[in-house]
From Swiss-Prot:
<keyword id="KW-0997">Cell inner membrane</keyword>
<keyword id="KW-0472">Membrane</keyword>
<comment type="function">
    <text>Could be involved in insertion of integral membrane proteins into the membrane.</text>
</comment>
<comment type="similarity">
    <text>Belongs to the UPF0161 family.</text>
</comment>
<dbReference type="GO" id="GO:0005886">
    <property type="term" value="C:plasma membrane"/>
</dbReference>
<protein>
    <recommendedName>
        <fullName>Putative membrane protein insertion efficiency factor</fullName>
    </recommendedName>
</protein>
<dbReference type="Pfam" id="PF01809">
    <property type="entry name" value="YidD"/>
</dbReference>
<keyword id="KW-1003">Cell membrane</keyword>
<dbReference type="InterPro" id="IPR002696">
    <property type="entry name" value="Membr_insert_effic_factor_YidD"/>
</dbReference>
Amino acid sequence: MKLLLLALIQFYRRWISPLTPASCRFYPTCSQYGLEAIDRFGPLKGSWLTLCRILRCHPFHPGGYDPVPPLPSCSCGKSPCD
């Protein structure tokens, strides 16, 4: 499922996005955000984060720098988490 979602985003970036004017208000772009979110959090949570990001990408939002959130850190003080 993860690979399918990543492939769909890559297809969009390669074949559809060049046909439309640049309109993403954020950095990284929404498609790059989607790739990173799905890769970092998996298909379910990554897709949810991407959908929320796309819904924020409209002319009435100021946009700006909006990175994918980091993975939760371990509260035990050890790295990596056990």
